[in-house]
Amino acid sequence: MIDHNIRTGKAFFGRRKGKRLRNSQLVLIKKLFPTLDINLNNSVPLNLTSLFSRKVKEVRLEIGFGGGEHLLHEMKHFPQTGFIGIEPFINGMAKMLMSLEEHKQYQNQLRLYNDDATGLLDWLPNASLDGIDLFYPDPWPKKKHWKRRFINMKNLNRFARVLKTGKKFRFASDIESYVNWTLYHCSNHHSFEWEAKNPKDWKTPYTLWSGTRYEAKALREGRAPTYLTFIKK
């Protein structure tokens, strides 16, 4: 019997786990994940593109990639971009690894991190990212829990430090209170400017947008997504 609370290197199993993992997923987490994992104990690279075995021209970050569908879509359409994906939930990471096992050509274009995003953000060099995506994060809908939302001034400071000038932070959600919360915080941060000029800009999906499973669920339940884009000044 496989122990689902074992650890592989860093704290990985035994936390933020939903459905029981299949043996094939456990094998990939043990063998494939360590080859893609970003170890924060290592020295910070002077050039972030050196993290990838493929030659890439830029690096983008997606925080909370779920099952990885959007990341796979982006890698297909942007072959000269290296991607860093953060997903603390084990089941989502396992799904991503299964996809990478099937589409091995993307393994040299992606690095993964399975813990708190703030740790990785603090490790990254200044002005090293060409984009940050945060799509359908946990909305913490109860007002007393809003302080737990990922968007806050401290994390926006982190974004501002690692994003290059002129590059984009993209945020999508179907929860109106979180959209308004994000607009408020970004509008009051000196390093970010909202790109929208008219309502169409935040109601229209991003160029080459693939959607996510969370967005599909929102649409089925009658909630309209909002797509925000902020430029790093």
Curated annotation (Swiss-Prot):
| Active site location | D138
GO terms of molecular function: tRNA (guanine(46)-N7)-methyltransferase activity
Q: Which Pfam families has this protein been placed in?
A: Methyltransf_4 (PF02390)
Record-listed S-adenosyl-L-methionine binding positions: E62, E87, D116, D138
Q: Which GO terms describe its cellular component?
A: tRNA methyltransferase complex
What positions does the entry give for substrate binding?
Answer: K142, D174, T212, R213, Y214, E215
Q: What catalytic activity does the UniProt entry give for this protein?
A: guanosine(46) in tRNA + S-adenosyl-L-methionine = N(7)-methylguanosine(46) in tRNA + S-adenosyl-L-homocysteine
Q: Which UniProt keywords apply?
A: Methyltransferase, S-adenosyl-L-methionine, Transferase, tRNA processing
What is its pathway?
A: tRNA modification; N(7)-methylguanine-tRNA biosynthesis
PROSITE patterns named in the record: SAM_MT_TRMB
What function does the entry list? Catalyzes the formation of N(7)-methylguanine at position 46 (m7G46) in tRNA.
Q: Show the PANTHER family listed in the entry.
A: 3-DEOXY-D-MANNO-OCTULOSONIC-ACID TRANSFERASE/TRNA GUANINE-N 7 - -METHYLTRANSFERASE, PENTACOTRIPEPTIDE-REPEAT REGION OF PRORP DOMAIN-CONTAINING PROTEIN
Family of the protein in this entry: Belongs to the class I-like SAM-binding methyltransferase superfamily. TrmB family.
Q: What is this protein called?
A: tRNA (guanine-N(7)-)-methyltransferase
Query: From which source organism is this entry?
Result: Bartonella henselae (strain ATCC 49882 / DSM 28221 / CCUG 30454 / Houston 1)
